[in-house]
Each structure stands twice: as structure tokens, then as C-alpha cells.
């Protein structure tokens, strides 16, 4: 199940707004496969990774790109607690993400099929190029089996187990732009459809 949503998640980049310049913005190929993303030069992967976050965060963020072995490798240490990667789910567009340490822990737990995330504080992650999620029978689901891929606009996330009953927040995408994804599961988190590139 985790292999379908890594970090949320969330999501293959729609690259819906390629004309808007972001930190390190250098448009990648639309529809690039994960294999093609991993084959990109260090410069191009870095530009793609940094395009996930607002400029003031991206300029001091750490960077991890795919090496020759296909694994993420750190090429720049973070000076502000955030780390950016060039793609997450890639269905089929690159969906770069910039995340803090709490989200990195959340991601690790998800990948390791942990029963619940172990981050002790809410985590913040940015996806300024947007992403996607799986929907089945009108609901956002974690598994891609039998589900359709739905594109998402630029957004940011708060990785914390928000409870819909307690917060009264929606549990599906809606005009307000805010909802709890995976509500009812330990990996529930808040989605905010707001372009991180416009945040200062």
C-alpha cells in the first residue's frame, strides 16, 4: 500500500503552471517517467527539487537527488531544516517535494509499513508543482488498486493525525481548498490547496 502513496501522497506533479518561475525553476519534461527523472543531470534534478518550495525556504533547503544506483543521495545539507527531492510518486509527472524533518520521519514510517507515523511534532511539506491522489467510489484512498488518479493543484501539507470529528474539517477536496486526507487512518494529514510560491 505504501508504495502507492509515498509522501503523500499525494501525488504526481501536474506542472500546470510552467510559466511561473519558482526557486530553481527549470521546467522538466512533461510526463517524464521515474526512470527518466532519475537519469536527469544533477543540475536538472536539483532545479526540479527546489521548484517545490517558496523561494525563502528553497534557498537554504537541503537537496537529495537520485544517484547512479537509483537511490536518493544528499548533495547539499540543509541550513533551515527542510530537504527537497525531485519527485515522489511520478504519476506520470514529476512531483517534487520540500519537507521538514518531521515529514521525513513520517515518510520513512510510511515506506516501512509502520502501523503509525512516529513524528512527535506536526510536519510541513510543500508541493508547489502540485501532485495527485487516488480516488475510489468518490473517496480519497491510499491504495491505487481499482482507483483513478486525480490531479491536485499546488499545495502544502501538515503531517499530523487530524481528526475530522474534533476539527470539523472536510475529508475530501472541496472549494475551500482544505481537507483531511486519509481521515480515520494513522496517516491522516491536512491538505491545503494554496500555492506555496505565493507564500512569503
What does each model-found stretch correspond to?
Residues 1-8:
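Bacterial N-terminal signal peptides that target proteins for export
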Residues 2, 17-18:
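Position-driven detector of the extreme protein N-terminus
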Residues 8-17:
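Bacterial N-terminal signal peptides
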Residues 19-25:
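Boundary at the C-terminal end of the N-terminal hydrophobic targeting segment
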Residues 25-200:
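Primary mode marks residue(s) on the alpha4-beta5-alpha5 output face of response regulator receiver
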Amino acid at each position: 500500500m505504501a508504495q502507492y502513496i509515498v509522501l503523500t501522497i499525494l501525488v504526481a506533479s501536474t506542472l500546470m503552471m510552467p510559466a511561473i518561475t519558482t526557486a530553481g525553476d527549470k521546467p522538466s519534461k512533461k510526463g517524464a517517467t521515474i526512470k527518466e527523472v532519475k537519469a536527469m543531470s544533477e543540475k536538472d534534478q536539483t532545479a526540479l527539487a527546489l521548484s517545490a518550495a517558496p523561494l525563502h525556504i528553497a534557498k537554504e533547503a537541503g537537496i537529495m537527488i537520485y544517484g547512479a544506483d537509483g537511490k536518493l543521495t544528499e548533495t547539499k545539507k540543509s541550513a533551515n531544516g527542510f530537504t527537497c527531492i525531485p519527485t515522489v510518486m511520478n504519476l506520470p509527472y514529476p512531483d517534487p517535494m520540500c519537507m521538514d524533518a518531521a515529514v521525513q520521519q513520517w515518510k520513512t514510517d510510511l515506506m516501512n509499513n509502520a502501523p503509525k507515523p512516529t513524528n512527535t511534532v506536526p510536519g510541513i511539506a510543500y508541493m508547489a508543482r502540485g501532485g495527485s491522489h487516488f480516488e475510489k467510489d468518490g473517496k480519497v484512498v491510499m491504495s491505487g488498486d481499482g482507483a483513478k488518479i486525480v490531479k491536485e493543484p499546488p499545495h502544502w501539507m501538515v503531517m499530523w493525525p487530524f481528526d475530522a470529528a474534533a476539527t470539523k474539517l472536510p475529508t475530501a477536496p472541496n472549494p475551500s481548498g482544505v481537507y483531511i486526507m486519509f481521515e480515520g487512518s494513522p496517516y491522516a494529514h491536512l491538505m491545503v490547496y494554496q500555492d506555496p510560491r505565493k507564500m512569503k
